[in-house]
Amino acid sequence: MSENKQALQVAALKNGTVIDHIPSEKLFTVVQLLGVEQMKCNITIGFNLDSKKLGKKGIIKIADKFFCDEEINRISVVAPYVKLNIIRDYEVVEKKEVRMPDELHGIVKCANPKCITNNEPMPTLFHVIDKDNCIVKCHYCEKEQKREEITIL
């Protein structure tokens, strides 16, 4: 490991995942969506860090955790331009971008107060009908919602 990495304010990650370029205002929603509070590994969360692209950003470093695409793509609903760096032996071995999945299970609340998911104990299911603009449609009542209208469960 180089001297430069040892001098970082936050320790370099030996193995694990770095989730970067999270808009600061969405950081804690991303933490919730990933279930970070349930994890037993070392986790570092950086909030309001300087960013050339975003002005301010959030970052999450999770030691010894490697997400499957399904787990990580959930966050595309709130943070569509997040970057993932897969770290092994202090080196970035893979870079990924989140991708909007075709369906969202139990993540989004339906905006229709008469929808069965708001009146019965059942999980929500949305079909993504426009990935670029994040427009989703409820499987049960067919109510469409745009990203700015979405409420996360």
Curated annotation (Swiss-Prot):
Signal peptide extent: none
Cofactors (names): Zn(2+)
Superkingdom per UniProt: Bacteria
Keywords for the protein's UniProt record, in alphabetical order: Metal-binding, Pyrimidine biosynthesis, Zinc
One of the Pfam families matching this protein, by short name: PyrI_C
A GO-annotated cellular component: aspartate carbamoyltransferase complex
Molecular function (Gene Ontology), one example: metal ion binding
Note on cofactor: Binds 1 zinc ion per subunit.
Binding residues annotated for Zn(2+), in chain numbering: C110, C115, C138, C141
Protein's job: Involved in allosteric regulation of aspartate carbamoyltransferase.
Subunit details: Contains catalytic and regulatory chains.
HAMAP family: Asp_carb_tr_reg
Family per similarity comment: Belongs to the PyrI family.
Protein's recorded name: Aspartate carbamoyltransferase regulatory chain
Organism this protein belongs to: Bacteroides thetaiotaomicron (strain ATCC 29148 / DSM 2079 / JCM 5827 / CCUG 10774 / NCTC 10582 / VPI-5482 / E50)
Record lineage: Bacteria, Pseudomonadati, Bacteroidota, Bacteroidia, Bacteroidales
Gene: pyrI
